[in-house]
Each structure stands twice: as structure tokens, then as C-alpha cells.
Amino acid sequence: MNVNEFSNEFDVLYNNIMSNAAPGLNEYEKSVLLTKAQEEIVKNYFEPAGNKYGKGLDDSPKRQIDFSELIKVGEGVLNTSAPTITFDKRAKVYDLPADLFLVINEAVDTNAGTKQIVPISYSDYTRLMSRPYKEPVKYQAWRIITTSINNISVELIVNSNETITDYKVRYIRRPAPIITTNLSSEYGDVTINGVSTVSECELNPIIHSEILQRAVELAKAAYQGDLQASVELGQRSE
């Protein structure tokens, strides 16, 4: 459906679910809710724990089709302006693509061949460094999220005698916001994810109705101030 259909059907569902008891929402408010609903659905489709079927992107060909418009392959860029001191002396800091939303998989090329990236937490790092052998196993490298002001950055760790030559990421990019009207002309200097003009939904039309339903449920929970309902929205029908 296009943005006009999103807006009109939102009004119908919202009025039905609220029995016309709640005040109507303007186009900016509807756009915020539709965009939030879209991002929540993408996350819940991606994470098995986020949906009632317990299936993630890899478990369902349908989900892979739903997200095909958003899947990209990009390269991380070595951050030469990062602090020269890293927690691990083997680590190199790379900036991830600016439009990255969720990582699917990643790999590095080194002078010893291609290594698959294994994301590790800070506690994982402590545990691994407590072992006698403190290197990634063969064909693997480690990745830790690190501090960055303007970018999403990671520290990549390979074996001490190896050098990274390239870092590739397959990922789901952040979908464009769903904006039903020109925000700058209607509401002044406001944007959603940096966008102020009309913006259509990029996702497969198959899940447009789910986005719409989620947005209406978010609106209902926000109006009623129902914390429990807001929590339950984290796992719905995806």
C-alpha cells in the first residue's frame, strides 16, 4: 500500500479499536508510529526470540523474501582517527556502513586467508583471555563493539601474526521511514530518521498490513499509558 492508504487505513483501524474515544492523530504522529512499527517488525522477524514461531531470518525462506530489498553487502572502513590505544593490542577499529541496521554475517580477509567473524561480548572477551590459548581458533576472528562518536565502530581481533586486508559485512540496512506527508511544509523543522519528505514503505507488500496493525497497537498503548501492553507488543504475530 502507498502512504495515502497507510494513513487512511490507520484512521479506520485506530477509530475502530479505540471506539472513537481517543483524539485523532496527525500525519506526523502516524508517520512516527508507522516507522517505529516497521523497525520493530524487522527486528522481530530477524530474532527468533522476537516472534511466536521462534524462527529467524535463516529459518524461513518467506522472511528472506520479505527482507530481500533490505539485504546489502558492504565493506567496513579502517578508522584511522580512532584512539591509538585499544584494550587489545591486536585489535583494529573499523567503521560499519552508515545505513546498517542488523548484521547477518561478516568476514575478514587476512594474509593467512579468509576468517569468519564471531561476535563476542565484553564478558566473552574476559573469559577467552583467561584461557591459556588467547587467540581466535583457525578460520575465525573476533568482533567487539567499541566506542565511536559519529559511526558504528567495531574492534576486530585476529591472531597475533596476521594482518587484516579487508572486512566485509552482509547486513540488513535501516529501512526508509514511512512518512505520509511533507513534514517540513506541515509541521516545520521536524524529520524522522533525517527525512522530512513523503517516503513510501520499502518492505514487501506482504507485510504492510502487519506494519499497519502494529502501528495502531502502538498508538493504543501510548494513549492508554498501558505499560504491560507496550511490553507485550515486543512479541506479537510475526
Swiss-Prot record:
CC per GO annotation: virion component
Keywords: Virion
Localisation per UniProt entry: Virion
Main location: virion
Claim: 4Fe-4S is one of the keywords in the record: no
Oligomeric and partner information: Homododecamer.
Note: The barrel is composed of five stacked dodecameric ring structures. Rings 4 and 5 are both composed of gp34. Podoviridae-like phages usually possess only one such ring. The tail is thus rather long.
Summary of the function given for this chain in its UniProt record: Forms the tail multi-ring barrel with ring protein 1, ring protein 2 and ring protein 3.
Protein name, per record: Ring protein 4/5
Annotated organism of origin: Bacteroides phage crAss001 (Bacteroides phage PhiCrAss001)
Lineage of the organism: Viruses, Duplodnaviria, Heunggongvirae, Uroviricota, Caudoviricetes
